[in-house]
Amino acid sequence: MMSLACAFCVQAGDEIVFTTVLENPITPVKNQNRSGTCWAYATIGYIEAELLRTTGKVYDLSEMFVASKDYVDCAEYHVRMHGNSRFSEGGSADDVLEVINRHGICPEEAMARPGSMIGDTLANFTEFFTTLEPYVESIAKGTSTKLTTQWKVGLQGILDAYLGKCPETFTYAGKQYTPKSFAQALGINKNDYVSITSFTHHPFYEQFVIEAPYKWRPRPSWNVTLDEMMTTIDQALKDGYTVCWGGDVSEDGFTRTGLGIAADIEHAPDLTGSDAARWLKLTKAEKAESLKKLGAQTPELVPTQALRQERFDNWQSTYDHVMLT
């Protein structure tokens, strides 16, 4: 498998044809299915790509191990905050690095496969989180004046029932490991990885914690200019590295046809003037269909530092999906 940076052209009939301009090796893509664990799948994929780059070996690491450990950490934090924080399926790349640092990691084969505890072949958190979230909230916002530790037993029971038990020891390639010793053997060090971002509401060339609902761990990012951020990403890809990044899939220009479009509605054919006003009244599905028809011919906005900041401030652009490039 390869991590692709692509350019595209349009052939007759508006068929979108992608041309590969750069490809870096990655492990096979996995399906998060009906689980809000893009953060775990994308970042584990990134770690696997790093191991492939540095060792030449293909590893299949367990996303559910990471999810289980992270939900314990997040639940404990949520309870300490008396419910005044966020507890949900979502997370960030920071969570994966911190889980590996604190708890280690295991291969996929050492733990129950995603979905297998409920008879599915892929992760499905529909029943799981409608059980887990109210349980944690009932503790965090309960009426108790003194908590016992038994709530943690119940929490772990729910996690084990739906995700499977995290192994204390396991055998891999003929050797016995703990999750911590396995992470050490792989050489995974969270301090080897740098997070960068670009906003003007904080000084450039300083670190700050991005204000996003899913980022409950206070791991900071370096703030650089937009041009410097993109130059850094481009250079990393050219040097053979992959990039794990957080973005927005809730905007109208996100499609499932391989295109992410920052549509310039004012200059889009059939969407100008009164049609532009009509555009604002369309449902999300109707907007998606309009963009699908225009495809690669859709006029796009030119991203600027000011536009990025404006859309972050007014909630048009949010941090709601983690991906691997």
Question: What annotation goes with each model-predicted range?
Answer:
Residues 1-7:
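Bacterial N-terminal signal peptides
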Residues 12-323:
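Catalytic-core signature of thiol
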